[in-house]
Every structure is written in C-alpha cells, then in structure tokens.
Amino acid sequence: MTQAPVQTDILEIAREQVLERGEGLTQDQTLAVLRLGDDRLEELLGLAHEVRMKWCGPEVEVEGIISLKTGGCPEDCHFCSQSGLFQSPVRAAWLDIPSLVEAAKQTAKTGATEFCIVAAVRGPDARLMAQVAAGVEAIRNEVDIQVACSLGMLTQEQVDQLAAMGVHRYNHNLETAKSHFPNVVTTHTWEERWDTLRMVREAGMEVCCGGILGMGETLEQRAEFAAQLAELEPDEVPLNFLNPRPGTPFGDLEVLPASEALKAVAAFRLALPRTILRFAGGREITLGDLGAKQGILGGINAVIVGNYLTTLGRPAESDLDLLGELKMPIKALNETL
C-alpha cells in the first residue's frame, strides 16, 4: 500500500487543516503564511475567503463607534493621539447623552447591529461609569441596537456593573504580541489587559479583542499575536492598521504596505477560522478602496462604518455599497437571522 505524500505547502496544509477541519493554524504555520511571496497573495486570499464562508457564513456584521470621552488619557500608548502625554492636537472633551443617543440612531440606520461607546481612559472612574450607565439605558430605550463598551481596564465590580447594564460586548485590545507590547506601551502591562478580558468573559459578556498592525512588530511577533488571540478565543477580533498620528512616538512610522496588510488579514482568518474578524481603523490609508474589497474577499466578515475616534473613515454609504456589490448580506438586515 502506497503511503500518501506528506504535504509541505502551507496553503495546502491550511486547506486541509482549517478549511476542512476548522482547526486554526499554529503560530509557526501562521508565520509561514505571513512569509509567503506576493505571487501567492491571490491564492491566499481565496483560501481565507473560503474559510470565512464555510465557518462564519456570508453575513457581514456592521458596527458604529462613538467617543464618549475624548483625549486627556494618562497612558502612553505610542500610537494614540488621545494620550495627554504627547504633543498631539486632540483635546479632552465629553459627549452628552442626547448626542450619544442620536449617534446610535444614525448607526442603526446603516443596518448595524452593534454600537460601541468608547472612552479614552486607563479605566473608568465613578463619573464615567455613571455616564455610561445613563447612556446605555437611554440607547436601549430608544434604539434597536446592541451596545458594546470600550472603557479601558476594569475592576471586577465595574465588570459586574457593565454586565448588569446589559452591555453585550466589551472591547479591550491587547494591541500587539506580548513580546512587542513594552515597545508600544510602558504605563501598564499586557497582563493587565489580559486580566480585564478574562473577567469580561467570566461575567458573560462577549469579548472583543484585537490590535494594530504596522507598529514595528516583526512577522514572528505578528504570528505570536495571532496565536495569543487564538488562545484567548475572543468573539470578535478588530484589525486596525497604524495610521501614524502627528505628535505621537509612532507618528513617523511608515504605513504598512497593502500586500503585507492583506497577507496579515488572511493569516489571522486562518488562525481564527470561526471568529468575527473586523476591518477597523487605518484600512483607508493602508488599503484604499481596492484593498477594502480584497480584504472582504480575503477573510473579513465585519466592518466599522463611519468615522473612528480621532480619524475619518469611509462614508457608511461607501461600505454598504461595497457589500451590496459583493453580494454580502448585512447581518442586521438579514431576515433569516
């Protein structure tokens, strides 16, 4: 009896392991994908799309985000213009509840299922928690949309309070691989972020955790990050691409090449076959319109529509038109769900 040859091509391995069996790539396998030449990009994106369609389905989840408290953050995340430690043009400001509700209404009109309230803080104080509670209640009373929050690091009491408010999902990004994190943030640790995510999961809220690509990490660290996210098993992974902000320590870094960004999108899909993988900040400057289409046909199954926290995004209509062109049903508008 002739023994079947051992498969050594990483995409053939991924086809059998991920597409057929639903088992995500290991760290070493993800690294092999990230090292593929541009001549195999189309093949890679096609496989990632097949994986997404088989294990997640065709629906695309749409989300909007709003900044409840902008700027003045005491942390030194080197990519962020909201840090009070850097000479960036962003200044501290609070959003009132009526404006928050109106933003949720406008987001819901796009077909979004998720509306995320974000605050630039290390972690929420009593004033912010009270404002969030009022905002969540007002939105739930007036808008048919699920509410998520992103408020930094939490105590157990705050986690329990958010769960009691009916917060559906909590976002807290690990941002990058554990080995690279000290080069990105020095005012708190990667482990502190992990602890918040663990408490969120144990409280019954969905976990949203991703990061930013293009912050000087190596391909090895990118693969490490994907493996660490796979260990966490978040419900959603937002993938941002560094949009260098003036006045920040990363303000002079180069934008990630589009082919490298698309390879990363596909690699993360192959490492996380069943996870909601969301296009987030920086895709406009990194990928443009063509790259956005390639990403959605290369593993992405969720988008943030409209603007981000301190940068402009694509108009919501542009993303919705693109999804229509690609025949990708929007989750909130799909009557079968």
From Swiss-Prot:
Binding residue positions for [4Fe-4S] cluster: C73, C77, C80
Cofactor(s) in the UniProt record: [4Fe-4S] cluster; [2Fe-2S] cluster
Details of cofactor binding: Binds 1 [4Fe-4S] cluster. The cluster is coordinated with 3 cysteines and an exchangeable S-adenosyl-L-methionine. Binds 1 [2Fe-2S] cluster. The cluster is coordinated with 3 cysteines and 1 arginine.
Key word Iron-sulfur present: yes
Membrane-spanning intervals of the chain: none
CDD domains: Radical_SAM
GO molecular function annotation: 2 iron, 2 sulfur cluster binding; 4 iron, 4 sulfur cluster binding; biotin synthase activity; iron ion binding
Reactions catalysed, as given in the entry: (4R,5S)-dethiobiotin + (sulfur carrier)-SH + 2 reduced [2Fe-2S]-[ferredoxin] + 2 S-adenosyl-L-methionine = (sulfur carrier)-H + biotin + 2 5'-deoxyadenosine + 2 L-methionine + 2 oxidized [2Fe-2S]-[ferredoxin]
A GO biological process held by the record: biotin biosynthetic process
EC number(s) stated in the UniProt entry for this protein: 2.8.1.6
Pathway: Cofactor biosynthesis; biotin biosynthesis; biotin from 7,8-diaminononanoate: step 2/2
PROSITE patterns: RADICAL_SAM (PS51918)
Keyword Ribonucleoprotein set for record: no
Keywords noted in UniProt: 2Fe-2S, 4Fe-4S, Biotin biosynthesis, Iron, Iron-sulfur, Metal-binding, S-adenosyl-L-methionine, Transferase
UniProt cross-references to Gene3D superfamilies, sorted A to Z: Aldolase class I
Function summary: Catalyzes the conversion of dethiobiotin (DTB) to biotin by the insertion of a sulfur atom into dethiobiotin via a radical-based mechanism.
Subunit structure: Homodimer.
Family: Belongs to the radical SAM superfamily. Biotin synthase family.
NCBIfam families in alphabetical order: bioB
Protein name in UniProt: Biotin synthase
Organism: Nocardia farcinica (strain IFM 10152)
